[in-house]
């Protein structure tokens, strides 16, 4: 029996354990001090302590995770998302230790992790990129002139950033200079890389991403699109597929562009290519590529009847896959995912750690409702980690039915909860 160590926690760890069980593989959970009795630990076949509650001393400690994998004789490591999922040094260490890395090659993670490099590679693959300037351009004397040519407002972004961190909208050149310095400092602290770049801010925009799976050797397929336009603080909260009110011809072009890009990179495994769609101009632009499983992957799984995590594991272990040809991948119906955060919307979405005293689970016995959750009633939500605790995914024959199913199964117990905010967004 193969043993898979999951280098993560919470709902994504639980989700990966589900695929391990489906494959009849042995799952290993890792945990910090505060996560000793967490759901992912209870759910796994085996578990091992990796350090203190601070992420830097546990879930971000590559050496401790690899040491744990060796101790329990794990065959492979699945990183999930967040933490070390897109850390090329961790991926390389895993490979060098003789353990299988469930993810793309480290050099791919490097090139896609730096948005400046990724933009250059996108251009070489004939993908349109949003008008902007790279990090080197910021040192040139004609910077103000070039910014005016792009046109304000402009988005200042950290080259190594992600999750909405290190992004600021500026409306004039004076504001831009201050923002660049501020973003550089923030990026250095958050990502260890102070490089920033500029991008034209498209006011009437949609955030569309294409789920791909690469097999190396210039081959990849897509699993259609996800619309992730409903966000707060540049972070997604509701995702759906298919994307509404965009011409299918444009979406097909986007998907084919994503496949071409992934193929040109000899990409291996699950990945997501993100685009900005200009509603007024009806044009799309390459944003970035995420070299990991996405939080919102269940949306895609729901409409394509696939298991992307299972595919990741099988591909890494050299097991034959079924969905390797584009004509075998079909979509059916409409799916909506709502992320549930332990936050207080009335206090600018401040995290709300504490004990879960009451948890009412919707009827997930229904085939059109799915709940990916990392907690049970009585569990403690910690302030050490991201406050997202669950995702509820509804599938209907069409968008209206899918949204209505979401509204039915997401109750509104009080006026000040993340659930009430999700209801507001759905309406």
Task: Please annotate each region the language model reported.
Residues 6-22, 27, 47-49, 72, ...:
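ATP-dependent carboxylate activation and anion-phosphoryl transfer catalytic cores
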């Amino acid at each position: 029996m193969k043993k898979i160590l999951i280098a993560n926690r919470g709902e994504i760890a639980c989700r990966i354990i589900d695929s391990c069980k489906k494959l009849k593989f042995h799952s290993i959970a890792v945990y910090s001090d505060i996560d000793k009795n967490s759901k992912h630990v209870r759910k796994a076949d085996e578990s091992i302590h990796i350090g203190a509650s601070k992420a830097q001393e546990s879930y971000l400690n590559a050496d401790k995770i690899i040491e744990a994998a060796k101790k329990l004789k794990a065959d492979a490591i699945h990183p999930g998302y967040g933490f070390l999922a897109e850390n090329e040094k961790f991926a390389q260490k895993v490979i060098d230790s003789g353990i299988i890395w469930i993810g793309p090659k480290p050099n791919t993670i490097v090139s896609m992790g730096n948005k400046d490099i990724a933009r250059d590679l996108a251009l070489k693959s004939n993908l349109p990129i949003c008008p902007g300037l790279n990090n080197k351009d910021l040192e040139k004397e004609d910077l103000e002139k070039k910014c005016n040519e792009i046109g304000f407002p402009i988005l200042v972004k950290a080259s190594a950033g992600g999750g909405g961190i290190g992004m600021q909208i500026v409306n004039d050149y004076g504001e831009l200079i201050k923002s660049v310095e501020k973003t550089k400092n923030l990026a250095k602290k958050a990502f260890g890389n102070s490089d920033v770049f500029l991008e034209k801010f498209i006011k009437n925009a949609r955030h569309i991403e294409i789920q791909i799976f690469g097999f190396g050797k210039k081959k990849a397929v897509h699993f259609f699109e996800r619309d992730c336009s409903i966000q707060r603080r540049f972070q997604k909260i509701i995702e759906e597929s298919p994307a509404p009110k965009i011409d299918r011809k444009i979406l097909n072009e986007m998907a084919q562009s994503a496949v071409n890009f992934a193929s040109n990179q000899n990409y291996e495994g699950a990945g997501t290519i993100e685009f900005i769609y200009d509603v007024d101009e009806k044009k799309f632009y390459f944003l970035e590529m995420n070299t990991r499983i996405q939080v919102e992957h269940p949306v895609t799984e729901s409409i394509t009847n696939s298991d992307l995590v299972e595919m990741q594991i099988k591909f890494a272990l050299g097991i034959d896959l079924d969905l390797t040809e584009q004509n075998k991948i079909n979509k059916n119906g409409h799916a909506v995912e709502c992320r549930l955060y332990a936050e207080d919307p009335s206090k600018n979405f401040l995290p709300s750690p504490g004990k879960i005293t009451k948890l009412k689970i919707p009827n997930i016995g229904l085939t059109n409702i799915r709940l990916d959750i990392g907690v049970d009633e009585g569990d403690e939500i910690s302030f050490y980690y991201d406050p997202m605790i669950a995702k509820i995914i509804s599938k209907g024959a069409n968008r209206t039915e899918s949204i209505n199913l979401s509204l039915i199964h997401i109750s509104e117990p009080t006026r000040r909860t993340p659930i009430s905010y999700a209801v507001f967004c759905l309406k």
